[in-house]
Amino acid sequence: MSNEFNAQSFLRTVSSSAGVYRMYDVKNDVIYVGKAKDLKKRLTSYFRKNLANVKTQALVSHIHHIDVTLTHSETDALLLENDYIKQYMPKYNVLLRDDKSYPYILLSQHEHPRLAYHRGPQREKGHYFGPYPNGGAVRESLHLMQKLFPIRQCDDLYYKSRSRPCLQYQLSRCSAPCVGKVSNADYDEQVKLASLFLKGKDQQVISALVDKMELAAERQAYEQAARFRDQIMALRKVAEQQEVSNNKGDMDVIGVHYSSGIACFHLLFIREGKIFGSRSYYPSVPAQTDMDEVLRSFILQFYLNADIQRTIPKEVVISHNFEELHELEAAVSEALDKKFSIKTNVRADRASFLRLAVTNATNAVVTRLSHKNTVEQRFVLLEEILELSTPIQRMECFDISHTMGESTVASCVVFNREGPHKGEYRRYNIEGITPGDDYAAMKQAVSRRFDKIEAGGKIPDILFIDGGLGQLRIAQKIVDEKFVHLDKAPQLIGVAKGEGRKPGLETLILGDTETSFSLEGDSPALHLIQHIRDESHRFAITGHRNRRQKTRNTSTLESIPGIGPKRRKALLQHLGGLQEVKGASVAELVKVPGISIEMAQTIHDALRG
């Protein structure tokens, strides 16, 4: 424990009331936040002799001072604890790093409503269905909806600009309300059915369609009856593929597995008795954290995270019981102002769902441990080959991508001992160089990466340069200049392509000595280097292609007299893209806001000329 902190003196001032405590280190950073029904009793437990828990020993050794906030009740303490954890992200707390908003399907409020992918604030009027566990689940659902219900999925600007049906009409995936190919009544009927389907009321939709099919057959409208028949068959096929519970309510089912420092919470989102989607969460868990704290922290942070727009069910089923379960129920209910119950001992359908969630959580942890061990072994071998005295904690790799010097982009990807650390990836748009000059591009990228680098900054142990000796020398020179005032600098290694660019034949070059060496093609250390090199290449080329496409779209239209950024944006949005603008007639161009007949003729002539 720090000599500057007098535990006995501090404990004499602590109240026995409920409240929250914040522990700080010598840098005045919050390292742990906790709550207690009796603050004096709880805080005293940290300073007993012979602490058994290794995590607690490490925590106490870093305490410089402690702040205490009293609360009216234990429920208030729970809520305040969650707020502080989210604010400070303390290193010794269990942290759920998942602030991404959840995706939804939007059924817009419009004369002819559209189905659309939506993520973020729900500003547009309409009905939002979800949440879905990820974007892929939404896109898959929208693709399915196109086959089942001929409702438009285009944006309103594209819808307004149509003078003839688009390809989706030809594929029977849209009824083309934009050009009057369907009556408003028939379109509204399909919208109602789609809404019921998204609410999980499959059988109600099928029953309604059966009635319509029989009515059409009685009227001898056999073509219409056949369309309803095909729609019914498609819906029945989908319904058969979905696992359905007799319980038609909404609930989240959480399977938990915690092993070797890795915790996985696998959630099944059950809506209207069906598995609406699933998702695994891996909170950051400090070593030696007990299971009760992991469970409590996850539930509290997951269901009280205001940054995540989520429809929270009244019932949560979880695989493990824990000490403060009822206090958590009360805290979440109070915070959300709605009934919220947590169940652990369940039977029938709930038990079946829970077994599935636990199996998924267990498999996920086993897979992660296997991957972690593999990556760890590769790091250890690389350390041995490079004869390093300290473990590698962070590696970075630079690559350059362009097409004949056009739209040059540099990438910097980051690996830690668990593999790719994608939140740290960076791209650099390269400007002001001779097109195609890879040396100048590398110089600019590395300079920007380490500009104003300080001792406390994120300094890689190894910096790979995807290229030969020339690019490596450029990067080494920049690093020498930028790190001259620091005690630590990264070890640079060039990764030169082998004969015929075949994997396994790479030549590695040390930046400081320019010594070259190769590794066996089956070396796990080489596989690690290839992985970071390939990831850097992928990230660079993706950024380059996006930039190139944007540049070409911009330059093609803005080279036309009178077309600036606003008109270019209006043209692309209304007509759906550059190719559609090129293929548009003068009459279609005039329909775009801000485009006169003279301007439309100018655009038409310029793009067709």
UniProtKB/Swiss-Prot annotation:
Q: Which CDD domains match?
A: GIY-YIG_UvrC_Cho
For biological process, the GO terms are: nucleotide-excision repair; SOS response
* Sorted UniProt keywords: Cytoplasm, DNA damage, DNA excision, DNA repair, Excision nuclease, SOS response
Q: What is its main location?
A: cytoplasm
The molecular function terms in GO held by this entry are:
DNA binding; excinuclease ABC activity
Disulfide partners: none
Listed GO CC annotations:
cytoplasm; excinuclease repair complex
Q: In its keyword annotation, does this UniProt entry include DNA damage?
A: yes
InterPro entries from the entry?
GIY-YIG_endonuc (IPR000305), GIY-YIG_endonuc_sf (IPR035901), GIY-YIG_UvrC_Cho (IPR047296), Hlx-hairpin-Hlx_DNA-bd_motif (IPR003583), RuvA_2-like (IPR010994), UVR_dom (IPR001943), UVR_dom_sf (IPR036876), UvrABC_protein_C (IPR050066)
Q: Where in the cell?
A: Cytoplasm
| Superkingdom classification of source | Bacteria
Q: Which residues form the GIY-YIG domain?
A: 16-94
The UniProt entry, under NCBIfam families, shows: PRK00558.1-5 (NF001824), uvrC (TIGR00194)
Q: How does it assemble?
A: Interacts with UvrB in an incision complex.
Function noted in UniProt: The UvrABC repair system catalyzes the recognition and processing of DNA lesions. UvrC both incises the 5' and 3' sides of the lesion. The N-terminal half is responsible for the 3' incision and the C-terminal half is responsible for the 5' incision.
Family designation? Belongs to the UvrC family.
Task: Return the protein name.
Answer: UvrABC system protein C
